[in-house]
A protein has these predicted regions:
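N-terminal small/glycine-rich loop or linker at the start of catalytic domains
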Residues: 12-28, 84-97, 121, 126
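Active-site groove signature of glycoside hydrolases
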Residues: 114-134
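Beta/alpha (TIM)-barrel catalytic core signal, keyed to glycine-rich beta->alpha loops juxtaposed to Asp/Glu
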Residues: 132, 136-329
């Protein structure tokens, strides 16, 4: 585990976020039991992580319930950590108006998240996907009102295009509303174009922050899927068949598996592990505010926290070598 956590500014906001953060997707309320979840959250906090990521749809709301119970009993000062939720896919119900980005669902989902997480406000609240069925003015105003009411401090988006983010800013400018300040996109050695190219103008103005997910390509960059999906792995989790097929049945997967072996060789030459290398590579991008880690075991989380010590080993030549291997296969 690294001796000192690094902290970065979230875009152009005044919020400081740990370079590594911890997310509840897949694991909390589903893949692991509550005692393990508690150990993971405490391990993360003790290592200096101050941002815990969640969403209404994670285990249909159960992930927030588990996290909320741990936070409530932790004794941690509320000012010492950040917690998020996301709205779009729905959580506990599946009736009309229980998903999407309508004003009604966004407000109800916020109230539900506050109840499940047992907090008085959300530090970050994301529109989990764009909703083409709802006027963007409605969604922007709903976020603005939640901020004015003190239920949300900052709002952002997840997997929105640059054009959609710019459209939201234009609406907020015109209506004098609080702007989105952060985007949560997928980012790893094999998935790079949106973060590195499409969003590039947004880092300068309006000053977009990023809280990236899937730094290890849902496990592909650990090397554990080179032969088959091991028992207990994320892609072996019930309900994750869609993700397993999206990764392992995608055209060109054989070339990526071969590339992973080459990346592992570079990691070995640097005296580190492939997961640490993959995470450190993400952190080398100055436009990344934080890398969200997921883990089902304390040992796994501790291992990945060591990525902070690998950053200094990623010299310009090493970065070129990594790019030569992964770049041609990245989307």
């Amino acid at each position: 585990m690294p001796s000192t956590m690094q902290y970065r500014q979230l875009g152009k906001t005044g919020l400081k976020v740990s370079a590594l953060s911890f997310g509840a997707w897949v694991t909390f309320g589903k893949q692991i039991g509550d005692p393990v979840a508690r150990k993971l959250l405490h391990t993360a906090y003790d290592a200096g992580i101050n941002f815990f990521d969640n969403a209404e749809s994670y285990a249909d709301g159960k992930a927030e319930v588990v996290m909320g119970a741990i936070l409530k009993k932790s004794g941690w000062r509320r000012g010492s950590y950040l917690v998020s939720s996301k709205v779009f896919f729905g959580g506990e119900g599946d009736r009309p108006n229980e998903d999407g980005l309508s004003r009604k669902h966004m407000v109800e989902a916020c109230h539900d998240a506050l109840r499940r997480l047992q907090v008085d406000y959300l530090d970050l609240y994301y529109c989990h996907r764009p909703d083409p069925t709802v006027p963007i003015e409605e969604s922007c105003r709903a976020m603005h009102d939640l901020i004015v009411q003190g239920k949300v401090l900052y709002w952002g988006t997840s997997e929105w295009s640059a054009a959609q983010i710019e459209a939201a800013h234009a609406v907020c400018d015109r209506l004098h509303l609080h702007h989105p300040v952060v985007e949560q996109p997928e980012y790893n050695l094999f998935h790079r174009a949106r973060v590195e190219k499409e969003y590039a103008p947004l880092y300068r103005s309006p000053g977009l922050g990023t809280t990236i997910w899937s730094p290890l390509a849902s496990g592909l960059l650990t090397g554990k899927y080179n032969k088959a999906v091991p028992k207990g792995a994320r892609l072996d989790t019930p309900g994750m068949e869609w993700l397993r097929d999206a990764i392992l049945k995608k055209p060109g997967i054989e070339k990526k598996v071969a590339a992973v072996a080459k990346l592992a060789a570079i990691a070995k030459s640097l005296g580190t592990s492939l997961p640490r290398l993959g995470i450190a590579w993400c952190l080398r991008n100055p436009n990344i505010s934080t890398v969200i880690l997921g883990a089902s075991k304390v040992e796994q989380l501790t291992e990945n926290l060591g990525a902070l010590d690998v950053i200094e080993k990623l010299t310009p030549q090493v970065m070129r070598d990594l790019d030569a291997i992964s770049g041609p296969l990245a989307d």
